[in-house]
Regions:
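Flexible coil/loop interruptions and hinge/linker segments embedded within long fibrous stalks
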Residues: 26, 144-150
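A broadly tuned, weak detector of single residues within folded domains
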Residues: 18-19, 84-85, 120, 148, ...
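Exposed extracellular interaction/assembly regions and N-terminal maturation sites
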Residues: 1-9, 14-103, 137, 159-191
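Beta-strand-rich solenoidal segments
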Residues: 79, 87-88, 101-146
C-alpha cells in the first residue's frame, strides 16, 4: 500500500515503505506540523476574482498549512479565497486588504457555509474549516460570539469585576429614559 497524505500535506507512510528515507520524510512531516501549529504567512490575494490556497503533498510552505494567515492586496473588486474540500483545521485570519471590497473564505466547491469580511472590514477572525461534508462542508466564524471593543453585544446577568468607565461615560437603561453619568470628580449622577 502506498503512502497517503492528510489534507494539509503530511505524508502518512505505510509500514515497511520508504526504507532508508524515513529520516528525511519524518523531518519534513515535523516541519509541516510546526507550520500548522503556529506558522504565519502573508498571502497576497488576486485583486479581483478568486485566490486558491493549495497544498503540495509532502512539502512545506503551503499558505493554507499555516495557523495564522494575513490576507494582503489592493482590491479592485470582491474576492474569494478557497481551500480544498479535505482541509479540517482552524485559522486566525487577518484581512489587511485595502480598498472597500469584501473577502469571502470558503471551500473550493459546494454550498456549505463560508466566512466573509464585509466591504472595508480589516478585522481578524478565528475560523474553522469543518470538512464535515464531502461535497458541501462548512467554514465557521468562531469570533461571532466574542465581545470586542467595538461590538454592541448585550450582556445579560453578567458580573463585571472592576470595570473602568471613561470620564463622561454613562450607563443607559434599556428604555433609554435615564442615564447614570460618571464625572471625573464627585459621585455618579442619575439623570
Amino acid at each position: 500500500m502506498a503512502s497517503t497524505y492528510t489534507g494539509l500535506g503530511t505524508q502518512l507512510m505505510t509500514t515497511g515503505e520508504k526504507a532508508g528515507t524515513w529520516g528525511t520524510l519524518t523531518n519534513t512531516n515535523w516541519n509541516i506540523s510546526e507550520q500548522i501549529a503556529g506558522g504565519y504567512t502573508a498571502q497576497a490575494l488576486s485583486t479581483t476574482g478568486a485566490t486558491t490556497l493549495a497544498v503540495n503533498d509532502g512539502t512545506t510552505g503551503a499558505a493554507l498549512a499555516n495557523r495564522v494567515i494575513e490576507f494582503t492586496a489592493a482590491l479592485a473588486g470582491n474576492v474569494t479565497v478557497t481551500i480544498p474540500l479535505d482541509v479540517e483545521t482552524f485559522y486566525i485570519i487577518k484581512n489587511s486588504c485595502t480598498n472597500a471590497y469584501s473577502v469571502e473564505f470558503k471551500y473550493v466547491t459546494g454550498s456549505g457555509g463560508s466566512v466573509t469580511w464585509a466591504s472595508g472590514d480589516t478585522g481578524t477572525k478565528i475560523v474553522y474549516a469543518t470538512a464535515n461534508d464531502a461535497t458541501n462542508p462548512d467554514i465557521i466564524d468562531a469570533t461571532t460570539a466574542f465581545v470586542t471593543a467595538t461590538s454592541t453585544t448585550t450582556l445579560t446577568n453578567k458580573t463585571l469585576t472592576a470595570p473602568k468607565i471613561v470620564d463622561g461615560g454613562f450607563i443607559a437603561d434599556g428604555g433609554g429614559d435615564e442615564n447614570l453619568v460618571f464625572g471625573e470628580v464627585g459621585t455618579p449622577v442619575n439623570e
